[in-house]
């Protein structure tokens, strides 16, 4: 695997059709922005993430760098994991070339645009932006100090000097813009109003977006003429690691008392038909997450709300039984999820790209086809 093979794959997928993207891909050396030691999203026999060291296996490292479809993981557990094969959560990466180019195409980036990048990480994405608009028009923010130092060093070594800020990207940039484009490189659940405030009228905000239930959308918003609201549709799929302050977390503290009932539907119909269905359901129950337990006849699924006050467990094997569903707390979370599933089916199982978000100072809401048609209604 090398740059030429990666380039051909991107061209074949239609991801380098804009001349500036081809030029930027050819100019910016991805290898200069990938550390010598990285992890791959491939598990070894012991359930650990595969570790690749350039000094020990330069060919494996280069294959990882130029794989068109796979990200390279540069940090686990916010830096708490040392070098070597390990378990842990991905907390920083160099995104796969295909999603990088797809996002840049959706950004509709003009030569004279001023750009705010949230999460510059390794600096690779930042360098591509600099190639298009010039380093003097790029402001990039990174929350992790260690990652920021590495990214800044790699950008400088490659000859790029955009304005780099270490801080919380959800607050935008000190001084406030205005920016023609805001591009985020981590998934979020709530669009920060600061990004809208710091955007020009008709400016574009592009971000991975998800819910506690499902993390799968790439959202493209346009700021309206008042500069106080942004709305737009999901333009494709993406699954990024969470922006740090919006990671879904649950401190479960449900009451001991519970109620039992049967399920109206096989949970496999609700949970086993793919991530696009999950995404549509999640837009209706954005504060609900689920996890599976057990195997075979003992398999079951647990749903919890983000407040930690309600939980529901549903058995798969005999979902029709009178005690197959067990609920704790004030919310019947499984009832909410199945209602969302029913709504999705009644709408004809709409594709992710028919959904959209409107965001403003007073919050955000999801809709289907047009802003007046709220999800679930």
For the regions a language model picked out, list residue spans one by one.
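Short amphipathic alpha-helical segments enriched in hydrophobics
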Residues: 14, 29-33, 184, 341, ...
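Long low-complexity, intrinsically disordered regions
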Residues: 287-292, 296-315, 320-324
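Class I SAM-dependent transferase core
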Residues: 1-116, 125, 147, 160, ...
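C-terminal target-recognition/interaction regions appended to catalytic cores
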Residues: 309-377
């Amino acid at each position: 695997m090398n740059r030429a093979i990666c380039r051909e794959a991107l061209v074949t997928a239609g991801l380098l059709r804009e001349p500036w993207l081809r030029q930027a891909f050819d100019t910016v050396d991805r290898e200069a922005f990938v550390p010598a030691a990285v992890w791959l999203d491939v598990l070894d026999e012991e359930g650990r993430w595969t570790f690749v060291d350039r000094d020990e296996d330069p060919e494996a490292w280069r294959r990882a760098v130029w794989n068109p479809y796979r990200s390279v993981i540069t940090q686990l557990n916010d830096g708490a994991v040392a070098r070597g094969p390990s378990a842990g959560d991905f907390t920083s990466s160099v995104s796969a070339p295909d999603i990088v180019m797809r996002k840049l195409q959706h950004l509709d980036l003009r030569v004279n645009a001023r750009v705010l990048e949230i999460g510059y990480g390794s600096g690779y994405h930042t360098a591509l932006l600099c190639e298009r608009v010039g380093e003097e028009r790029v402001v990039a923010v990174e929350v992790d100090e260690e990652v920021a130092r590495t990214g800044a060093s790699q950008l400088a070594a490659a000859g790029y000097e955009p304005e780099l800020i270490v801080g919380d990207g959800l607050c935008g940039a000190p001084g406030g813009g205005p920016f023609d484009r805001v591009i985020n490189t981590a998934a979020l659940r709530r669009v920060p109003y600061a990004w809208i405030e710091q955007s020009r009228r008709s400016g574009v905000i592009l971000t991975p977006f998800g819910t506690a239930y499902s993390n799968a959308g790439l959202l493209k918003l346009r700021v309206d003429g008042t500069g106080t609201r942004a709305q737009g549709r999901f333009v494709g799929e993406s699954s990024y690691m969470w922006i740090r302050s919006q990671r879904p977390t649950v401190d479960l503290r449900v009451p001991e008392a519970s109620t039992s009932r049967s399920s109206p539907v096989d949970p496999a119909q609700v949970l086993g038909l793919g991530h696009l269905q999950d995404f549509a359901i999640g837009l209706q129950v954005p504060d609900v997450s689920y996890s599976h337990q057990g195997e075979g006849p003992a398999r079951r699924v647990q749903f919890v709300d983000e407040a930690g006050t309600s939980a529901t467990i549903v058995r798969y094997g005999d979902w029709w039984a009178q005690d197959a569903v067990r609920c704790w707390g004030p919310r019947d979370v499984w009832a909410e999820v199945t209602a969302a599933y029913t709504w999705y089916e009644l709408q004809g199982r709409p594709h992710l790209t028919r959904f959209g978000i409107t965001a403003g100072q007073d919050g955000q809401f999801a809709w289907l086809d047009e802003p007046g048609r709220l999800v679930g209604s």
